[in-house]
Amino acid sequence: MFGCYKIKSVETLVTLGKSKLEEGDFDVALDLFQQAILLDQKDPDLWNLTGIALRSMGRYSEAVECFNKSLSLDPRDKDSS
């Protein structure tokens, strides 16, 4: 949910999440990325973005888990934080 709307597009969730991440609104960004993961659990970029949001919130062990998940899905992903 974003506001009173239920978003069902991974692309829209990611776009909004990245915007919130840039604004420093990490809680909302995390929520949006987690919603995107519910729609596509096999996208390593979603796990990486979730890790970035968690790291920004100081939730380091959870962030590492997300980065590891991203790498397990795509071991060649040089962008995985």
Task: Report the location of each language-model feature.
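Conserved structural position within tetratricopeptide repeats
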Residues: 35-38, 68-72
